[in-house]
């Protein structure tokens, strides 16, 4: 995996697409793309509009599926024979690589949508031969149809693979509905598979600082290069890469060691011959290959002649049974550098006999082998301490691996309310961002009206109520279903201290809302209560209603109680730190100047909030006139009547009587009267993009028209309500 000029596993053939002219992105490469806001619509979904995947999965006979999967494990097929007569190792890799694309920085990747079926993941160099794994599963997927998604089946198969080889897993949850097109995800800027860190489009800067939010060391890898950094077989240097990439997938050192050791107890790698024998990836291969790629001309191209990573390593004496060989071999043998038949760097035990079975010839044995990244677990001091404990206490390894595997394969599913099936563990885990179950009677319509009155007479301005509710709810990420207003974690560390949340103002606001909450709860004779999480959202609703009335268009903002307040003990501070916004165009906030323009960061935020382009547009316009910017900045507040929910932002942005010029401050513009030159407004790139970008201008013109005030208010309320309820999986 060290070739920089051209990856042997990348496509060199002719693509199976008709010829076409340049796209808009070709002509204008810096043009803002709104495509991320238009993914996964009903237009690409073959299911009936009323199809309910959760209901379908709950009707599934999971035990029967698992029985079929158990049978498949040892049903070796001639077209792709099973190593050691068991597909377990292959299926563990398939599930691991499906889940392992997850990254905590933006929550994207992971196993939750079955994205391994689509480009680019289906053709990544690190996923060679996983096309065969999914094809082996097709008869089972075909049998059970829409009752189990590919996303769920892939993870379930990994679990069954472990169980069939004697390992007790922690549990399994379904609930991952398939998508039907590739996610639009930034995987890096490299133009070459496996480009090295010194390349023209490197993801590294400074002292090997990995670009955010990426969580793999090279384009086309899941985590690290198993040969070492850029192919350098240095276990200590490799440990640094391992620690960084696994941390970016929300794994600590113990979980990392357990995953590597546990996963590498099974199966083998494949590097029977030179990579030059390997053909085109699935996306490039000819139509006759029917979605299968990497056809090899080395020997039979399969079985004993298979080439996948180019490495040829088998870790244990029983590759199809859970045992403790990984750490026994790691610590009890000394290791010397060698090369695989494909020329890749790997390690072989010194002065040790041939104890490792051959995958296809029972009469053959070989010496124990390991990867550079395996040796990192011995030669990195922190990893060594954990590894030695696992070596001395195999039961601790088994428990740690079962928990880490469960976390790996379920990390992007969000709260336990989304988990389905009979094998969901009862234990609540902190990485699931637990929230207490509702334990009181909920407020009714009269209570809601009374609380709104208390809120609006508290002295808290509309702008503060709106910005606080937005700050609470807009932490939600549709990528990994984390964040949101439920739990009221805005009052807990770390969110209460985030700069974007204006800690001093937030503390005062929450104190007043808590006074209202306490007064209401103390006045109840029964078990009726209002949570702070509900009250924060209700306060935002009351403020929006008042602002709409101020604009002459009274409206009712929907509100459904049922949120609860999480505790600090239920909150993983480090995990939430990764979610701190560095930009929020809805509040005109930039932590600092980035090499990505503010308008692109706005679209990225909107996509995480699952918003469409019209929803993004109406929310920005509304939040500006409600004066909800961080620090009460006046950039983009294009109105003379702030805190009235008017369409003034669009009217004034589109006013041809205003001339815009860049100001001295980065990313800030001044709007001057075209006749007098007098300063009228200031704005940022996240504002002016709605007049500059042709698609966004078309939307702005809808809301800037003279007949748009009422529809603007209704559309804003609908989009606002959507954001406030993004994490209400209990309402689904």
From Swiss-Prot:
Q: Where is this cross-link: Tryptophyl-tyrosyl-methioninium (Trp-Tyr) (with M-249)?
A: 96-223
Question: Which modifications occur after translation, per UniProt?
Answer: Formation of the three residue Trp-Tyr-Met cross-link is important for the catalase, but not the peroxidase activity of the enzyme.
One GO BP annotation of this record: hydrogen peroxide catabolic process
- Which positions are annotated as binding heme b? 264
* Gene Ontology terms, MF aspect: catalase activity; heme binding; metal ion binding
Catalytic residues, chain numbering: 97 (proton acceptor)
User: GO cellular-component terms in the record?
Assistant: cytosol
The keyword Transferase appears for this protein? no
Reading the lineage from the top rank, the first entry is: Bacteria
Q: How is the cofactor bound?
A: Binds 1 heme b (iron(II)-protoporphyrin IX) group per dimer.
The protein's UniProt keywords, in alphabetical order, are: Heme, Hydrogen peroxide, Iron, Metal-binding, Oxidoreductase, Peroxidase
EC number assigned by the record:
1.11.1.21
Which cofactors does this protein require? heme b
Pinpoint the site Transition state stabilizer. 93
* Gene3D superfamilies in UniProt: 1.10.520.10, Peroxidase, domain 2
Sequence segments annotated as region (Disordered): 1-29
Q: Which reaction does it catalyse?
A: H2O2 + AH2 = A + 2 H2O; 2 H2O2 = O2 + 2 H2O
**What does the record give as the function of this protein?**
Bifunctional enzyme with both catalase and broad-spectrum peroxidase activity.
To which protein family does this belong? Belongs to the peroxidase family. Peroxidase/catalase subfamily.
Q: Which NCBIfam families match?
A: cat_per_HPI, PRK15061.1
> What name is this protein filed under?
Catalase-peroxidase
Q: Which organism is it from?
A: Serratia proteamaculans (strain 568)
């Amino acid at each position: 995996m060290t070739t920089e000029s051209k990856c042997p596993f990348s496509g060199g053939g002719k693509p199976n697409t008709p010829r076409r002219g340049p796209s808009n992105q070709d002509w204008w490469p810096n043009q803002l793309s709104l495509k991320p806001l238009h993914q996964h619509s009903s237009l690409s979904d073959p299911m009936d509009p009323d199809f309910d995947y959760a209901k379908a999965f709950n009707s599934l006979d999971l035990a029967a599926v698992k029985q079929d999967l158990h049978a498949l494990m040892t049903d070796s097929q001639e077209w792709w024979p099973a190593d050691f007569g068991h597909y377990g190792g292959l299926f563990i890799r398939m599930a691991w690589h499906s889940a392992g694309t997850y990254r905590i920085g933006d929550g994207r990747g992971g196993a939750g949508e079955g994205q391994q079926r689509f480009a680019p993941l289906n053709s990544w160099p690190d996923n060679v031969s996983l096309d065969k794994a999914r094809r082996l599963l097709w008869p089972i997927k075909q049998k059970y149809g829409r009752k189990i998604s590919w996303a769920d089946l892939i993870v379930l198969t990994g679990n069954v693979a472990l169980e069939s080889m004697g390992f007790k897993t922690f549990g399994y949850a379904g609930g991952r509905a398939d998508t039907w097109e590739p996610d639009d995800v930034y995987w890096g800027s490299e133009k070459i598979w496996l480009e090295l860190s010194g390349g023209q489009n490197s993801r590294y800067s400074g002292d090997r600082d990995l670009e955010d939010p990426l969580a793999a060391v090279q384009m086309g890898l899941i985590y690290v290069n198993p040969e070492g950094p850029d192919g350098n077989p240095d276990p200590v240097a490799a440990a640094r890469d391992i620690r960084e990439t696994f941390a970016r997938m929300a794994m600590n050192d113990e979980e990392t060691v357990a995953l590597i050791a546990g996963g590498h107890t099974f199966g083998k790698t494949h590097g029977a011959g030179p990579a030059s024998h390997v053909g085109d990836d699935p996306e490039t291969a000819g139509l006759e290959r029917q979605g299968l790629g990497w056809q090899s001309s080395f020997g039979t191209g399969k079985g004993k002649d298979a080439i996948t990573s180019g490495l040829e390593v088998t870790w244990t004496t029983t590759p199809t049974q859970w045992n403790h060989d990984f750490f026994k071999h790691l610590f009890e043998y000394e290791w010397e550098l060698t090369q695989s038949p494909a020329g890749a760097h790997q390690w072989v035990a010194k002065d040790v006999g041939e104890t490792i079975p051959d995958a296809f010839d029972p009469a053959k044995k070989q010496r124990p082998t390991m990867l550079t990244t395996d040796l990192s677990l011995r030669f990195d001091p922190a990893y060594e301490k954990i590894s030695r404990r696992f070596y001395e206490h195999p039961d601790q390894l088994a428990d740690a691996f079962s928990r880490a595997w469960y976390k790996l394969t379920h990390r992007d599913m969000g709260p336990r309310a989304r988990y389905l099936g009979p094998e969901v563990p009862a234990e609540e885990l902190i990485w699931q961002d637990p929230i207490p179950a509702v334990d009181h009677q909920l407020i009714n319509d009269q209570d809601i009206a009374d609380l709104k009155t208390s809120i609006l007479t508290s002295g808290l301005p509309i702008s503060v109520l709106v910005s606080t509710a937005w700050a609470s709810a807009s932490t939600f990420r549709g990528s990994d279903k984390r964040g949101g207003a439920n739990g009221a974690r805005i009052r807990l560390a770390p969110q209460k201290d985030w700069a974007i949340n204006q800690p001093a103002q937030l503390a005062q606001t929450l104190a007043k809302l808590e006074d209202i909450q306490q007064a209401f709860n103390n006045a109840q004779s029964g078990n009726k209560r209002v949570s702070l999480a509900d009250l924060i959202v209700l306060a935002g609703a009351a403020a929006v209603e008042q602002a709409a009335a101020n604009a002459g268009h009274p409206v009712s903002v929907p509100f459904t109680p049922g949120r609860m307040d999480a505790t600090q003990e239920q909150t993983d501070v480090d995990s939430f730190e990764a979610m701190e916004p560095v930009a929020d165009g809805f509040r005109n906030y930039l932590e600092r100047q980035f090499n990505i323009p503010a308008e692109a960061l706005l679209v990225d935020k909107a996509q995480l909030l699952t918003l469409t382009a019209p929803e993004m547009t109406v929310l920005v316009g509304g939040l500006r006139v409600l004066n909800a910017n961080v620090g009460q900045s006046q950039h983009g507040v294009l109105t003379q009547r702030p805190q009235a929910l008017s369409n003034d932002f669009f009217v004034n942005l589109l006013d041809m009587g205003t001339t815009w010029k860049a100001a001295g401050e980065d990313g800030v513009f001044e709007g001057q009267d075209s006749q007098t030159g007098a300063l009228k407004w200031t704005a940022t790139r996240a504002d002016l993009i709605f007049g500059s970008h042709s698609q966004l201008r078309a939307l702005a013109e809808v809301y800037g028209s003279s007949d748009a005030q009422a529809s603007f208010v209704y559309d804003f309320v609908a989009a606002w309500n959507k954001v406030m309820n993004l994490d209400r999986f209990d309402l689904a």
